[in-house]
Amino acid sequence: MAYVNGTTNGHANGNGLDLCMKKEDPLNWGVAAEALTGSHLDEVKRMVAEYRKPVVKLEGETLTISQVAAISARDDSGVKVELSEEARAGVKASSDWVMDSMNKGTDSYGVTTGFGATSHRRTKQGGALQKELIRFLNAGIFGSGAEAGNNTLPHSATRAAMLVRINTLLQGYSGIRFEILEAITKFLNHNITPCLPLRGTITASGDLVPLSYIAGLLTGRPNSKAVGPTGVTLSPEEAFKLAGVEGGFFELQPKEGLALVNGTAVGSGMASMVLFEANILAVLAEVMSAIFAEVMQGKPEFTDHLTHKLKHHPGQIEAAAIMEHILDGSAYVKAAQKLHEMDPLQKPKQDRYALRTSPQWLGPQIEVIRSSTKMIEREINSVNDNPLIDVSRNKAIHGGNFQGSPIGVSMDNTRLAIAAIGKLMFAQFSELVNDFYNNGLPSNLSGGRNPSLDYGFKGAEIAMASYCSELQFLANPVTNHVQSAEQHNQDVNSLGLISSRKTSEAVEILKLMSTTFLVGLCQAIDLRHLEENLKSTVKNTVSQVAKRVLTMGVNGELHPSRFCEKDLLRVVDREYIFAYIDDPCSATYPLMQKLRETLVEHALNNGDKERNLSTSIFQKIAAFEDELKALLPKEVETARAALESGNPAIPNRIKECRSYPLYKFVREELGTEYLTGEKVRSPGEEFEKVFTAMSKGEIIDPLLECLESWNGAPLPIC
């Protein structure tokens, strides 16, 4: 069912759709609900596909956050902005209306009046009024030298703001010439970015102060600056020449300055950038939670669809279904199932919450991020200045669409969701590096031969605590810190851009955490591979020694100790390999202790045969241990060396798993190393590779490849 809210842009509605096929939706709830149909993953895939298109065509009401992200982040990739010619007539009509009303003496806010709390003042000098508007709004502070960069809005956010502002003004309610929109478009397409102050807006009445610097460049204000495609600072004259904007600087006509500055484009533009990344990071968190379950030898029943169906929340159901898909058929899950069956009392009946309730934890965060995405998408397609020029009714409407509450609220909510994702990630990472919880992995994920000289991810765990603490602080809301502004005219204001900026910081921190966790998971995967090869070596060696020493007596007769082998191998199966492998034959480590206990127990059960030296099991213990000490350390080192040279006896199970594309990307494409204290390379050097790739969006394809065979539904309940 399609919905129609009964509004048009004040000009001809040429969509030609049969109204019989539409359901009236005057309050827009139907459209909002319909936008949330389908899976979150499918929406992310659409966003990625749209992000990669070479052209963004602006029509006024069809802009997406992925298009904003594309223009903001890909200023050197040739992505171009095009304006719909169909919008020209409507834009011109509103501009002409302003000039006509001015000539007729009509009294309109910002055209013949002062601004804000001083709107009781009047003037007939419409152009001079717009010039003064831009002058007094140029109140930002940049600093000088290195300080200037710290106080300048990131160029990516400025590009986003330019795109969103053009889109709003294209709808023909703002009273501005089409030529000005074309000029801003040329700046975008030639990678020329005005310098905007980082701070100074409360996003009501729009983002007045930062947007005034775009207007300042257009009008050639001497304090205006821009940055060119090579990073060189440009004067307004140089910017116009490089962009090919002809006719000189613009002399603003009545209402045009107000049209440029009185909108929410900076806050919503940055919010669009933030949400594009947040949606992808949410999917990454789902997949990494599944990988966490794999390397932790978790029980996959936590993803069973019935559990989540009975809870009803769509975000939770989808998160569980995605994890279920990754774990379905996983070689790690199959191996873990055998371990659980062999000794069900070796670990708790249920996995800890960071694993078992990860769908319940992530689901609401995904719903919040998705809802915020739609809210911002509505905002970037809205007309959000004042007054609005309604040509069809021949009037200017004075209202408050400049109030950026959708931005402030959605960004506060998104930041809280990001912090929750980070909290889960920290809990999972803390389990992963702790040998008390991680089901046999070494402490700190240390990969070397000598744990006394290898502390693995200990520094990374400290860094993760720092990241998580800062992220939780950022989760505090911005919107409850409103101050009454502009002589108490702007007595409530959204703080939209401030909240967007803080959410951008939160996304950066979540990327740091995601990077660290992903490299840690890859280390754990390699350690499980090493564990499997070493355990096989130990079992084979114990079996060989048992057969040689325990099978025959001194005269070649079968010895009672031959029945010990099965129990000795069970010891190897049950003992965590990394609890002893650095010195496998040490009497203080569990392997030799448990092997000896097993032999002693058999000896105690041997009865009177122990009195006979030829049939005594106890007499065999020393020979067994001596033989094992002579052979096992060499075999262990041989197995390690074979794996390090790329010739392990047992291949890495990850290649049989749906999570393999992410591992392959991190290890092969980015060339990260298995970390040990024996090597020079630090964890941070490997993290840098992954973080850089993540920031460039290079992780998207391997992430989506993990899920390319998912049909968008949970496995059937059977």
UniProtKB/Swiss-Prot annotation:
The keyword Lyase applies. The keyword DNA-binding does not apply. GO terms for biological process: cinnamic acid biosynthetic process; L-phenylalanine catabolic process. There is a cross-link at A204-G206 (5-imidazolinone (Ala-Gly)). The modification 2,3-didehydroalanine (Ser) is found at S205. The active site is at Y109 (proton donor/acceptor). It is found in: Cytoplasm. Keywords: Cytoplasm, Lyase, Phenylalanine catabolism, Phenylpropanoid metabolism. Pathway: Phenylpropanoid metabolism; trans-cinnamate biosynthesis; trans-cinnamate from L-phenylalanine: step 1/1. InterPro entries: Aromatic_Lyase, Fumarase/histidase_N, L-Aspartase-like, Phe/His_NH3-lyase_AS, Phe_NH3-lyase, Phe_NH3-lyase_shielding_dom_sf. Its EC number is 4.3.1.24. It catalyses: L-phenylalanine = (E)-cinnamate + NH4(+). It holds the Pfam family Lyase_aromatic. SUPFAM superfamilies: L-aspartase-like. (E)-cinnamate binds at N262, Q350, R356, N386, K458, E486, N489. GO terms for molecular function: phenylalanine ammonia-lyase activity. Contains an active site 4-methylidene-imidazol-5-one (MIO), which is formed autocatalytically by cyclization and dehydration of residues Ala-Ser-Gly. GO terms for cellular component: cytoplasm; protein-containing complex. PANTHER family: HISTIDINE AMMONIA-LYASE. Homotetramer. This is a key enzyme of plant metabolism catalyzing the first reaction in the biosynthesis from L-phenylalanine of a wide variety of natural products based on the phenylpropane skeleton. Belongs to the PAL/histidase family. This is Phenylalanine ammonia-lyase 3. It comes from Petroselinum crispum (Parsley).
